[in-house]
């Protein structure tokens, strides 16, 4: 093996500290595995509809979903319908969409309902953003149940910066409108919610005694900030983070999930009474 090959392999490996943290949390009584999707389970792509989870990540996540005392969840900025379409999550995986504004907790879950005032405000927000997009080649809008997203990934940097600045100048003081910066996006919403609230909510309804969360975007910092002692937070990428641990890219998330599946499978098997002598 060449030095370059060894270096590439080393970069793919999880750190010993992260491996130990995974081993420890795998033994918790009830484990919540909560993952961001884009940039975490799936590589970032030019068109949102083309995103798909890496096969290894999807397989390990599905394996975790069927283990005893283990809950899997996706916490995404995507609308729930979009998240389901691209992620194809295991049937019992809980879903938090639109940065916490939407939730699917199983059959019978009700959808998000906006008040008339919120609907009117959302229409105003879209009209503002439509005018901006007309003058900013490469930008586009994405509608969500509670907001509109200004995408700038395909625009030149100067065009993207000007478009976001124009949107902020009009909307940041508008009462009832909430803005979030993401990677080449500006999220607008008429519902004040965050991925942090999503993590806290899922912990409460599942009774989780330990949470592992991984995410790549600035909006994932809200979720990382809500983690408690004994939880494991993982930043995907090289940007600033308050997470205890870091991996470089979605391919490393696949490795993380595979290690977690292995360790959690061992932990729940050791705690399950045998039937050989019965």
Stretch-by-stretch model annotation:
Residues 2-15, 28, 191, 196-278:
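Mg2+-dependent phosphoryl-transfer enzymes with acidic/Ser/Thr/Gly-rich catalytic loops
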Residues 98, 105-123, 127, 180-208:
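Substrate-recognition "cap/lid" segment bordering the active-site pocket of phosphatases
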Residues 26-46:
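Asp-based phosphoryl-transfer active-site loop
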Residues 125-129, 162-171:
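Short amphipathic alpha-helices in soluble, non-transmembrane regions
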Residues 52-143:
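Active-site phosphate-binding/coordination module
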Residues 147, 167-186:
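Histidine/lysine/aspartate-rich catalytic loop segments that bind and position anionic ligands
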Residues 149-160:
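A short secondary-structure junction motif
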Residues 13-29, 82-89:
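Short amphipathic alpha-helices and their capping/turn segments at secondary-structure boundaries
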